[in-house]
Amino acid sequence: MLLANPLKNLGDINGTIYDFGKMGDILPKHNHEENTVHITIVARGKIKAYSHDWEVEGIAGQILDFRPNEPHEFMALEDNTRIINIVKKFGGQSNDYQQVNT
């Protein structure tokens, strides 16, 4: 079973942590807008990313980069695989940081 946990408070950067409980779990085919950068960090386990004319495998510690408007899908190749997807829009505002007094 695939679980998704959105990352919060990242300004113009959006992200989601995906946990694949079992080998064979799939994050369905999707694509990202033309004005975005999309990277995936393989946090643990092993993953296969693929599209109509390519496929790539990634293991824990690897970063995968995707072109805009390129449909792709992910499949876990090991139980308990985790990926972190980060999407940043071009031309977005930088994050607003507020100092915290401790």
Predicted regions and their residues:
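A short glycine-rich, His/Asp/Glu-containing loop-to-beta-strand
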Residues: 1-30, 36
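Double-stranded beta-helix
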Residues: 11-19, 75-102
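Short, surface-exposed charged micro-motifs
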Residues: 17, 39, 63, 73
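Hydrophobic residues in beta-strands and at strand termini
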Residues: 20-22, 42, 66, 76
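Short beta-strand His + acidic residue motifs that chelate non-heme Fe in jelly-roll/DSBH
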Residues: 28-29, 49-50, 66, 72-78
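Short, conserved beta-strand element in jelly-roll/cupin
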Residues: 32-49
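Short acidic-glycine-tyrosine-enriched beta hairpin
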Residues: 52-69
